[in-house]
Amino acid sequence: MLDIYERLGTHCHDPVYTTVTLTHEQRDRGRLKLVGENNEEVRVFLERGKPLLVGEFLKSECGKIVQVAGAVEDVAHASCEDWEAFSKACYHLGNRHTKIQIGERWLRIKPDHVLEDMLHMLGLIVTHEEAVFVPESGAYSHGHSHH
């Protein structure tokens, strides 16, 4: 069993001992009990409020390196050719504090029929797909205070 208390960031030159594949919701939690790809139990004890990143490296108490991978999960994918419609869609989702992954005139959200209907009414084409969900971290996630 590996106990993890330390984050190493997204760059590490040490060999990876095992990988854990996590959904977006799992990457958002500070305490996890998992099984690595090598079938070894992995317990994570990290600071809450700082989601794990896909590709991030963690270090166990015994010095072994564990890498975080993103799990493929069901997402709603919305797209359009019109930048104005796309901008409005992003605005309305942000106004609802919805976690959103943004590309060039496409976005992904967790499936939600109300939000999907809104996106459709704004002119976006909405489909469901299986993909790794990596939403934007948010404007205030860097932790700096400017008071």
UniProtKB/Swiss-Prot annotation:
SMART domains tied to this protein: UreE_N
Subcellular localization, as worded in the UniProt entry: Cytoplasm
SUPFAM superfamilies listed in its UniProt record: Urease metallochaperone UreE, C-terminal domain, Urease metallochaperone UreE, N-terminal domain
Keywords: Chaperone, Cytoplasm, Nickel, Nickel insertion
Cellular component annotations (GO), alphabetically ordered: cytoplasm
Transmembrane segments annotated in the record for this chain: none
GO BP terms: protein folding; protein-containing complex assembly; urea metabolic process
Pfam families per UniProt: UreE_C, UreE_N
Domain of life: Bacteria
GO molecular function (one): unfolded protein binding
InterPro entries: UreE, UreE_C_dom, UreE_N, UreE_N_sf
Gene3D superfamilies, A to Z: Urease metallochaperone UreE, N-terminal domain, UreE, C-terminal domain
Annotated family: Belongs to the UreE family.
Functional note: Involved in urease metallocenter assembly. Binds nickel. Probably functions as a nickel donor during metallocenter assembly.
Name the UniProt record assigns to this protein: Urease accessory protein UreE
